[in-house]
Amino acid sequence: MSEKFYRATYLNVNLDAILANYQNFNQLHANKTVISVIKANGYGLGSVKIAQHLMRHGATFFAVATLDEAIELRMHGVDAKLLVLGVVPTEDIEKAIQHRVALTVPSKAWLKETIKQIPDDNQKNLWLHVKLDTGMGRIGMKDIDEYKEVVDLINKRDHLVFEGVFTHFASADEPGSSMNEQYTLFKEMVNQVEKPIYIHCQNSAGSLLMDGQFCNAIRLGISLYGYYPSEYVKDNVKVHLRPSAQLVSETVQVKTLKVGETVSYGRTFIADEEMTIAILPIGYADGYLRSMQGAFVNVNGSQCEVIGRICMDQMIVKVPSHVKTGEKVILMDNHVDSPQSAEAVANKQGTINYEVLCNLSRRLPRIYYYDNNEEVTNELLK
């Protein structure tokens, strides 16, 4: 291990599982470029390590949400193509050019202001992907005339490159989806002007559920990490994904709770019998939220209930009497059918697996497993 950590709580990340998922989609869409979406710190798992591992195995294109995320990757030696999916402030355009980062064009107004910000003596290219709003209702242009004007403006300027056009599906992971309607509209709009190098509209759900031959690239997000976008998608595809993250802690104290005694804030749990409890050094500041009270965790093979309110840094679990200090506890597992799967955690929290992963705090050390290696990253000690 290259770094250390000083708390018995950590996140296991299997980079080989992520690579297997990437290769799976590479085969599924063999005639397309796979754009690996590693925004939000690689959905909480670590964008730098993920990018570095995928690049070692042939990945050439990544997408992030912000220019800051792109620059972070460049600072860590990621020299692959990078696309920022969000809107970059026009006053920061020179930074994008400096770091060779492709940007999203959300509107004609943004593009005109961007052109003003580019120095007259600039000799470096700025790659642009035009965003079309076909039904998501977020950034992007809905008007075909605006799209034509934007492409024309790009083509008239030296060092501006019309590299891509894309849209985003609003409900590709749901039954009775409007995905096909959006796809049809996207094709109609794109066909009105010359086609750029990259045409992409499929997210993870779209990549699993539709062929999308009009496009020559896909954006692989949640499924890159081994998770299905929804139960509907999981039930309607035959593609096997490998979940890559496991949240682990350890019992740091074991004690007996007598009848009538309480635990944690608000005294919401009152013992109705004598029982053994264990304290874990993990809390909602790590991403294991208060709504997980009443959930079950795996304490060395035993399913044990979370009792009392989860604190910022600690939580309490009811355990069998044989449990001792120092025993391993799995709070989120890397198996689809586990009672502690990311989906099970999401259901308990009343949310989706995306949010569960993204909530994983930076203070959690990440232990990366790849090519028979084990490497620790501790953001707090950098």
From Swiss-Prot:
Q: Isomerase among the record's keywords?
A: yes
Catalysed reaction(s)?
L-alanine = D-alanine
**SUPFAM superfamilies annotated for this entry?**
Alanine racemase C-terminal domain-like, PLP-binding barrel
Q: In which pathway does it act?
A: Amino-acid biosynthesis; D-alanine biosynthesis; D-alanine from L-alanine: step 1/1
Positions binding substrate in this chain are: 138, 312
Q: What Pfam families does the record tag this protein with?
A: Ala_racemase_C (PF00842), Ala_racemase_N (PF01168)
Q: What is its EC number?
A: 5.1.1.1
- What molecular function does GO assign, one term? alanine racemase activity
Q: Name one GO cellular component term.
A: cytosol
* Transmembrane region(s): none
**From which residue to which does any coiled coil extend?**
none
Query: Which of UniProt's keywords are assigned here?
Result: Isomerase, Pyridoxal phosphate
Tell me which cofactor or cofactors this protein depends on.
pyridoxal 5'-phosphate
| Broadest EC class assigned to this enzyme | isomerase
Q: Which residues carry this modification: N6-(pyridoxal phosphate)lysine?
A: 39
| GO biological process assignments | D-alanine biosynthetic process; peptidoglycan biosynthetic process
| Gene3D superfamilies the UniProt entry points to | Alanine racemase, Lyase, Ornithine Decarboxylase, Chain A, domain 1
Record: active site: 39, 265
Q: What does this protein do?
A: Catalyzes the interconversion of L-alanine and D-alanine. May also act on other amino acids.
Q: Which family does it belong to?
A: Belongs to the alanine racemase family.
This protein is called Alanine racemase
The scientific name of the source species is Staphylococcus epidermidis (strain ATCC 35984 / DSM 28319 / BCRC 17069 / CCUG 31568 / BM 3577 / RP62A)
Q: What is the lineage of its organism?
A: Bacteria, Bacillati, Bacillota, Bacilli, Bacillales
Gene name? alr
